[in-house]
Amino acid sequence: GIKVVEDGAHSIGSTYKYKGETYKCGDCQHVDLCTYSFHPVKHITTGEGGAVTTNDSDLFQRIQNLCKHGIDRRDHMFSDKERRGSWYYEMDSLGFNYRLTDFQAALGSSQLKKLPEIKRRRREIVKYYNQELSQYEELQVPFESPSVDSNFHLYLLRVRPGMKADRYDLFTGLQRLNYRPMVHYIPIHLLGYYKRNFGYKQGDFPVAEKCYQESL
């Protein structure tokens, strides 16, 4: 069957409810794999890098092999005659060098312990932002479903159409006040590579374009 991969780059620490049960994003109860990003802008970081979670032992072993050049040291890969020392290894398929360094892993482990407090603090800030910004009719603050407990990796405002100052003016005005706003994300089909290679053009995905034009 088709394997389902969850993009958990922004979701670490978040939970959701399904049929009355609470699940953590990345526990792979409804997917085969979940990928995490530990880029410096994420909730926790290893400087750079990421992780994959799965409950499938075959997928786990495949990932283990792929991240270290395809090298496999499990006993069943060798005959008794071949297996004469612990230095033996086999390479059944080619892989890559996707391993974190010890320093990166140590940083990530220490950051992971701080995740509950990081999430609590971010949710506290979001609550304050929502209270202060919801008074402006031109802005729509983030909505959280009762079935979700978000880590709020991003605080996304919708700039409603008809606002006196457009999004660009609002963006640059915030910059002048020493805030650091950002727009997430440019629709993929509007980027040059996808236009050239797949023939996409503006207007192909109007909902994505509208969300982009109104997001801050």
What are these regions (language model features)?
Residues 5, 41-42, 47, 98-101, ...:
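Residue-level micro-sites within transmembrane alpha helices that shape
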Residues 48-49, 115:
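Short active-site oxyanion
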Residues 36-37, 50-55, 109:
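Short beta-strand-to-turn element immediately C-terminal to the catalytic PLP-Schiff-base lysine
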Residues 1, 15, 19, 55-216:
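PLP-dependent aminotransferase class I/II
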Residues 7, 50, 213:
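Conserved phosphate-binding and hydrolysis motifs of nucleotide-dependent enzymes
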Residues 6-45, 87-91:
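Conserved active-site segment immediately N-terminal to the catalytic lysine
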Residues 9-10, 39, 48, 64-68, ...:
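Histidine-centered beta-alpha loop that forms part of the nucleotide-sugar donor binding/catalytic region
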